[in-house]
Amino acid sequence: MLEGAKLIGAGAATIALAGAAVGIGNVFSSLIHSVARNPSLAKQLFGYAILGFALTEAIALFALMMAFLILFVF
Amino acid sequence: MLEGAKLIGAGAAVRTMTEGSSNTSNANGVPIPIPGSTGIYEDHPGLHPAVDERVVEYQAGIREQMSELMRMDGEHPEVVAAAERVHGESDNIAFLQGLLEDLRAHGRESEAFKYGVPNDAPLPGGGNPAGSSGGVDLANGNEAGSSAGVDLANVDDAAAAESPLDQFGIHPILDLNIGEYYVSFTNLSLFMLLTLGLVLLLVFVVTKKGGGKLVPNAFQSLVELIYDFVLNLVNEQIGGLSGNVKHKFFPCILVTFTFLLFCNLQGMIPFSFTVTSHFLITLALSFSIFIGITIVGFQRHGLHFFSFLLPAGVPLPLAPFLVLLELISYCFRALSLGIRLFANMMAGHSLVKILSGFAWTMLFLNNIFYFLGDLGPLFIVLALTGLELGVAILQAYVFTILICIYLNDAINLH
């Protein structure tokens, strides 16, 4: 009973990935838009984009952490 | 053994009794078909919606009770083995209910517990401990339990060796206890010392005999690269200060970046240990840095630092909520800083481990198509390793740049 509930909970925790996917897509689409408008800033913008990507990805990893907590801690 | 036989006898008696009289309903009020009827539940007892679920529930209850009595974790193989001995995988509700009530009422003195955890089982570490007849002694009960479930524990260890999280295990190399504190030298400490040694060796080699050659060799280039990189970061991110004051923070930030970079990269060496995949380490780092930054803020602004919590130009009625929100988000910075690094490292390493385990298994399936098809997973593992190398560098960078941003916030009060 509890085992099954744990698995369901861990699976449900991965729904959060949808948000992270949208976020990462948004970061890079904005990068392409910006570089298309002003190619001379490409290098600087890429740095910002990578930072934004890392921050967004970290949110997805919080979801992963929740899944691990549900599976192994309780 | 005698008790066990008695117990089984009692269970059998209960079973026959309930089967004989179960023509009305069981304890749950669910009607059970009369013997002799051609109900579908009688022909296929597994189909009964209530019985199956309740059997599992009772068996779990027995395991829980056993784990409480044995003072061990419910997932512990010995507990599982003992619980299985007690209920014997029976699907008879009344029998299971009786066992559970016996366990609840009599605890360690109950027939069921004594059957599940035999006192006369041979102990691995020598003879029977004194006072085993009582069966109430804590240490004794634990020892008896451990010897009883020893076979299953071995089996479980072999299976557990495949878990992708095993690589993060901390094992003591030198056991040390000072007073009540456990201060063993573990593989974690070993790899942290290795990282430190590596960084110090690199810096030592470069600065030997005054260092700073006009034409740098490879090592000097590397150190200069890192130094320049962090110096640029500090100069760009922290504003509103003269160069001298700004550079008081520079050594701390440089050391943090170098330490994290080398920890992360060292973890990418196969069969090594990733220090930053433990939030023991990352949270200790992020919390101490967070406290340091807060102290810097109070030093520079005194009590005026609290204005940090209230953005300028906010209407007064909104202020209490905003202060609360800002306070929470400020405190959460410390947590998110550490967890981001930890989660990235742990997730990446587990992923590589899972996929490489998959490729490894596929290689030995004795089938030429699988053998050739294994190139696919292999390349995915290779690509992921490349990605992880990037993430290792990127996360050190992100950690450092966030420290700079937070420091800038504390100094300039947005």
UniProtKB/Swiss-Prot annotation, chain A:
Among the GO biological process terms of this entry, one is:
proton motive force-driven ATP synthesis
> What kind of membrane protein is this, topologically?
Multi-pass membrane protein
User: Which cellular compartments is it found in?
Assistant: Mitochondrion membrane
Q: Which PROSITE patterns match?
A: ATPASE_C
Signal peptide range equals none
The subunit structure is:
F-type ATPases have 2 components, CF(1) - the catalytic core - and CF(0) - the membrane proton channel. CF(1) has five subunits: alpha(3), beta(3), gamma(1), delta(1), epsilon(1). CF(0) has three main subunits: a, b and c.
Single GO cellular component annotation?
Answer: mitochondrial membrane
What is the recorded function of this protein according to its Swiss-Prot or TrEMBL entry? This protein is one of the chains of the nonenzymatic membrane component (F0) of mitochondrial ATPase.
Top-rank lineage group of the source organism? Eukaryota
Annotated site, Reversibly protonated during proton transport, chain positions? E57
Q: Tell me what this protein is called.
A: ATP synthase subunit 9, mitochondrial
Pfam families from the UniProt entry: ATP-synt_C
Record organism = Oryza sativa subsp. indica (Rice)
HAMAP family attached to this UniProt entry? ATP_synth_c_bact (MF_01396)
Tell me its family.
Belongs to the ATPase C chain family.
Q: Which GO terms describe its molecular function?
A: ATP binding; lipid binding; proton transmembrane transporter activity
Q: Which UniProt keywords apply?
A: ATP-binding, CF(0), Hydrogen ion transport, Ion transport, Lipid-binding, Membrane, Mitochondrion, Nucleotide-binding, Transmembrane, Transmembrane helix, Transport
Show the stretches that span the lipid bilayer: 8-28, 53-73
> Which SUPFAM superfamilies does the UniProt record give?
F1F0 ATP synthase subunit C
